[in-house]
């Protein structure tokens, strides 16, 4: 318990100066005087400070930044842009050394000398390795991460009421909904056995669609801490030059992505729930690759029916139906 309170104070002190600045901007209290205009340059500087702070505070806060980078309904565009760097610029030292997990789980079946680091995430690190003559990818959970995440989730839960003081009414609604789901989502994301199972299921669902690539898994190498999968290279989905090089218009790729996610949600009932640019790429032959299934979710038949009804109402412009 003492460790929790120390951590809470540490986090509070890190965010306190920026919190006061935001309150001052909006004149949330009389002692701050009239509200003031804040330039884009100042907002960018603050966004960079917040990004650096989340990196310093560790995996749970990095994950908060990653989620916020996909929520323009909560944070302004300048912050979305800066937080987006957390999608693929997380240093290996952001958590414990993942190599200890690789050595414990796979030393007998993988030649460790063939391991090459590829990318760092808030909860895991990705390597490539040689296995049975193939190049595979290993998503490895950071050691000790579960205890760290559980502690910091308590801290984040305690900070939400303070965060609401900085938000306007529209943002408050979005923040409360996000806070309610965030804890469940991140704890599920730590279960790599669940991820590899859902990944294989989604792969089966697209077996007849050669436009979509879901990397094949290696069940014998997967565990609660490791997801072993086919290594699939791709170009960033946001790189218009890369799309042009393979003969794809951005609108064409956007349509494919939309149709893919509609199929997952409305037809299959199991879907990849983290479609930020760091998790989507395009192959040299123009296929869409989807990575990282930790945030995948399921929809019940009733939920699918409700979403389908909503889309029909929107298409018909039926205001009363909404």
What positions do the PLM features span?
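N-terminal accessory/targeting segments that precede structured cores
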Residues: 1-125, 131-132, 154-175
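Activation of the activation-loop gatekeeper triad in protein kinase-fold domains
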Residues: 292-296
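Glycine-rich ATP phosphate-binding loop
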Residues: 134-142
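Conserved beta3 strand of the Hanks-type protein kinase catalytic N-lobe
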Residues: 129-130, 141, 275
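Long, amphipathic alpha-helical stalk/connector segments used for oligomerization, subunit docking
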Residues: 316-322
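ATP-dependent phospho-/nucleotidyl transfer catalytic cores
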Residues: 77, 84-88, 150-151, 163-271, ...
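Hydrophobic residue at the +6 position relative to the catalytic HRD Asp in the kinase catalytic loop
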Residues: 278-282
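Conserved N-lobe beta3->alphaC-helix segment of eukaryotic protein kinase catalytic domains
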Residues: 143-158, 189-191
């Amino acid at each position: 318990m003492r460790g929790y309170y120390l951590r809470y104070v540490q986090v509070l002190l890190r965010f306190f100066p920026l919190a006061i600045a935001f309150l001052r901007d909006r004149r949330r209290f009389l002692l701050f005087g009239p509200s003031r205009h804040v330039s884009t340059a100042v907002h960018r500087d603050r966004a960079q400070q917040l990004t650096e702070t989340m990196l310093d505070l560790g995996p749970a806060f990095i994950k908060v930044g990653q989620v916020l980078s996909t929520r323009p309904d909560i944070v302004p565009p300048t912050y979305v842009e800066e937080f987006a760097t957390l999608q693929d610029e997380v240093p290996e030292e952001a958590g414990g050394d993942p190599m200890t997990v690789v050595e414990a789980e796979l030393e007998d079946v993988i030649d460790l000398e063939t391991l090459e680091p590829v990318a760092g995430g808030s909860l895991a690190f990705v390597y490539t390795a040689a296995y049975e003559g193939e190049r595979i990818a290993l998503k490895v959970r950071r050691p000790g991460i579960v205890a760290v995440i559980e502690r910091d989730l308590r801290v984040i839960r305690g900070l939400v009421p303070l965060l609401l003081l900085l938000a306007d009414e529209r943002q408050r609604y979005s923040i409360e909904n996000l806070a309610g789901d965030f804890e469940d989502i991140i704890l599920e994301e730590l279960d790599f056995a669940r991820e590899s199972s859902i990944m294989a299921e989604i792969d089966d669902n697209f077996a007849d669609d050669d436009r979509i690539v879901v990397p094949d898994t290696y069940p014998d190498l997967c565990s609660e801490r490791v997801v072993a999968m086919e290594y699939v290279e791709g170009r960033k989905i946001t790189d218009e030059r890369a799309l042009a090089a393979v003969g794809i218009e951005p609108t064409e790729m956007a349509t494919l992505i939309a149709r893919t996610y509609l199929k997952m949600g409305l037809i299959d009932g199991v879907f990849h729930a983290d479609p930020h640019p760091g998790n989507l790429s395009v192959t040299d032959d123009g296929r869409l690759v989807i990575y990282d299934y930790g945030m995948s979710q399921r929809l019940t038949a009733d939920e699918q029916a409700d979403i389908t009804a909503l889309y029909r109402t929107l298409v018909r412009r039926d205001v009363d139906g909404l």
